[in-house]
């Protein structure tokens, strides 16, 4: 009698995991990442921006330390590797998150902030030749122009610019410079490092810079309401841990292009979620302009199949 075929349970589980990561995973990541914008702005009603970030970073460090005790990941082997993590941590956690939170506190719409910082892939593509020797073509320049035109269109569609509205936009541009600088630095000088220790060092850098600034320049009173605790829990667990872990898992599954394409939808998704959570409404002209900006990012980052 013929024997039943042997089924490798481990392989079956790995296949099922890859299937989930390539179908459901990207949309879960998009939701978690996009919701971070309006949820962060909600939390800023209960704490000053740098105080809020300091608490978020401290909790993230605590959670990651506990995970590191269990997992025992590899730590940076030399001073150069430590320095790389510190620089990236400053650019991402202090400049990107710090200026983003200050921008939201100053009154920028979360949909506009999400759109401005989503131009990062275009700027990386345009600036890469100068910093990492990559060649730039007409397609990237076209994407850059469309992205900038769309972003400007969204800002103008919300009303005329004046000193009070220009400040938050400049802070958002500073956040864009921070995340772009981090990507360029990684492309040129970054080293491969375990994600656990990398995130732990970077969040620690964020805390070391933001906490003293909060003590010096902010009133550090926090309204520990259920809403604030919920937003903090979401940003620490949903954004800092689950979303980043999911992103890395999808990358390992070989779906980098699929993840990159979903980033095009972060601005409109953030706009919809900002309407749901905050009641922020974009005029019709702003939606058209956002479409132009998203198209620009898509054109600039699209890689033809070989």
Where are the model-predicted features located?
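Glycine-/small-residue-enriched transmembrane alpha-helix faces in small-molecule transporters
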Residues: 2-54, 60, 161-188, 209
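Juxtamembrane helix-entry segments on the extracytoplasmic side of multipass membrane proteins
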Residues: 18-23, 46-50, 54, 77-83, ...
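Specific transmembrane alpha-helical segments of multi-pass solute transporters/efflux pumps
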Residues: 32, 36-37, 65-111, 116, ...
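Transmembrane alpha-helical segments that form core, pore/gating elements
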Residues: 39-41, 64, 124-126, 130, ...
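Helix-helix packing/entry segments at the starts of transmembrane helices
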Residues: 53-55, 112-119, 185-208, 236-276, ...
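C-terminal transmembrane-helix exit sites in multi-pass transporters
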Residues: 63-72, 120-145, 268-287
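Hydrophobic transmembrane alpha-helices of multi-pass small-molecule transport proteins
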Residues: 64, 136-158, 175-179, 210, ...
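Cytoplasmic-side transmembrane-helix entry/capping segments in multi-pass membrane proteins
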Residues: 80-88, 136-148, 168-169, 193-203, ...
């Amino acid at each position: 009698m013929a024997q039943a075929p042997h089924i490798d349970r481990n392989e079956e589980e790995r296949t099922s995991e890859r299937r989930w990561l390539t179908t459901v995973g990207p949309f879960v990541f998009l939701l978690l990442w996009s919701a971070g914008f309006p949820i962060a702005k909600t939390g800023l009603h209960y704490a000053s921006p740098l105080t809020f970030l300091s608490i978020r970073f401290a909790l993230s460090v605590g959670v990651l330390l506990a995970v590191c005790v269990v997992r025992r990941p590899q730590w940076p082997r030399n001073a150069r590797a430590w320095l790389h993590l510190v620089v990236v941590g400053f650019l991402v956690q202090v400049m990107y998150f710090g200026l983003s939170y200050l921008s939201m506190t100053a009154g920028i719409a979360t949909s506009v902030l999400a759109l401005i910082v989503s131009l990062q892939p275009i700027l990386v593509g345009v600036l890469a030749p100068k910093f990492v020797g990559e060649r730039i073509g007409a397609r990237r320049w076209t994407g850059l122009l469309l992205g900038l035109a769309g972003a400007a269109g969204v800002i103008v569609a919300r009303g005329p610019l004046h000193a009070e509205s220009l400040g938050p936009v400049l802070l958002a541009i500073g956040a864009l410079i921070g995340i772009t600088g981090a990507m360029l630095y990684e492309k040129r000088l970054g080293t491969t490092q375990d994600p656990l220790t990398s995130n732990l060092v970077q969040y620690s850098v964020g805390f070391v810079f933001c906490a003293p600034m909060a003590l010096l320049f902010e009133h550090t009173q926090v309204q520990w309401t259920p809403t604030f605790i919920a937003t903090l829990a979401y940003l620490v667990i949903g954004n800092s841990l689950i979303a980043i872990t999911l992103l890395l898992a999808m990358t390992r599954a070989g779906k980098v292009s699929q993840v990159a394409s979903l980033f095009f939808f972060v601005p409109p998704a953030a706009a919809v979620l900002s309407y749901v959570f905050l009641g922020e409404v974009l005029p019709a002209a702003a939606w058209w302009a956002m479409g132009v900006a998203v198209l620009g990012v898509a054109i600039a980052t699209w890689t033809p199949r070989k």
